[in-house]
């Protein structure tokens, strides 16, 4: 099944639902960063959460940054997701592995530890909106749901899941169901929805059982006036890094540092944290940067 995002509404627009399948892009992240099992689960959940949050943004080019900063051995997570369906991300310690937790599951909470969740929404106007909440469990789903309730005042049910087998990621994705203000006062509706979400065994078991996103929506909201939007959105792992950006970053180091790199290393190597791509800048590239800096200095002087 292709990685995709599907939107739906129910209760005359009082309930908003978004589902994502992110199996392939999570596997790509695992391969790019050579992630351990628990690191794959942690990053995969956070990427799915980022895509779900970005889906509610309106302006083209809007993006959301999700940073999980905990005191656990994973050493943090950073994800950048866009309304356009692209996502990228990395963890601080990609090779960490822990024993299963008390439920026999990958111990994402133990890997993340205690700390904070930072969310920055950039809608393209130059004034990003940022918010911080304390981590509830470190399991990502609980933490993002807590953010949505406390920072956006929107009652939300969030399910995230990643299943990693011996051959890689076989199922990944998430589901976000939000009760909007027009329906939040209907206590019976909210209770009914909470009961149904709570009865689910998890998101990845549904995918492994062959359930599609529309079928999951029907199981949850089929008798609540469900409307599924016919257009699905393709999701993919994508990083906007480039050699030109690397040269721009190297140029900011200044003439003396660049000259030192030429003498000691005969060039420079840079690795993109988000996608793991390695860039090589030769001594000729660095020499040209020095020439550019000298030219700019003489012009400005």
Curated annotation (Swiss-Prot):
Cystine residue pairs: 239-241, 272-275
Pfam families: HSP33
Subcellular localization, as worded in the UniProt entry: Cytoplasm
Gene Ontology cellular-component terms listed: cytoplasm
Main localization (coarse): cytoplasm
Modified how: Under oxidizing conditions two disulfide bonds are formed involving the reactive cysteines. Under reducing conditions zinc is bound to the reactive cysteines and the protein is inactive.
A GO BP annotation: protein refolding
Family classification: Belongs to the HSP33 family.
PANTHER family given in the database record: 33 KDA CHAPERONIN (PTHR30111:SF1)
Protein name listed in UniProt: 33 kDa chaperonin
Source organism of the structure: Trichormus variabilis (strain ATCC 29413 / PCC 7937) (Anabaena variabilis)
């Amino acid at each position: 099944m292709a990685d995709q995002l599907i939107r739906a509404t129910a209760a005359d627009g009082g309930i908003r639902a978004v589902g994502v399948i992110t199996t392939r892009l999570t596997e790509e992240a695992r391969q790019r960063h050579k992630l351990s099992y628990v690191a794959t689960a942690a990053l995969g959940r956070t990427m799915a959460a980022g895509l779900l949050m970005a889906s509610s943004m309106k302006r083209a080019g809007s993006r959301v940054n999700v940073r999980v900063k905990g005191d656990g051995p994973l050493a943090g997570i950073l994800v950048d997701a866009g309304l356009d369906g692209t996502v990228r991300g990395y963890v601080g310690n990609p090779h960490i592995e822990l024993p299963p937790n008390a439920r026999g599951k990958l111990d994402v909470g133990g890997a993340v530890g205690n700390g904070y969740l930072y969310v920055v929404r950039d809608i393209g106007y130059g004034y990003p909106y940022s918010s911080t909440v304390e981590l509830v469990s470190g399991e990502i789903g609980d933490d993002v749901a807590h953010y949505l309730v406390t920072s956006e005042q929107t009652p939300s049910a969030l399910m995230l899941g990643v299943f990693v087998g011996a051959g890689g990621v076989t199922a990944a994705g998430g589901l976000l169901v939000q009760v909007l203000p027009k329906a939040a006062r209907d206590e019976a509706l909210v209770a009914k929805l909470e009961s149904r979400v709570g009865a689910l065994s998890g998101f990845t078991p549904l995918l492994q059982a062959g359930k599609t996103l529309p079928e999951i929506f029907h199981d949850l909201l089929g008798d609540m006036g469900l409307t599924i939007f016919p257009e699905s959105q393709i999701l993919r792992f994508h990083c906007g890094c480039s050699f030109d950006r690397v040269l721009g970053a190297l140029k900011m180091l200044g003439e003396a540092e660049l000259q030192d790199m030429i003498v000691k290393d005969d060039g420079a190597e840079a690795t993109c944290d988000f996608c793991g791509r390695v860039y090589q800048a030769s001594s000729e590239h660095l020499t040209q940067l020095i020439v550019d800096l000298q030219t700019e200095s003489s012009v400005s002087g």
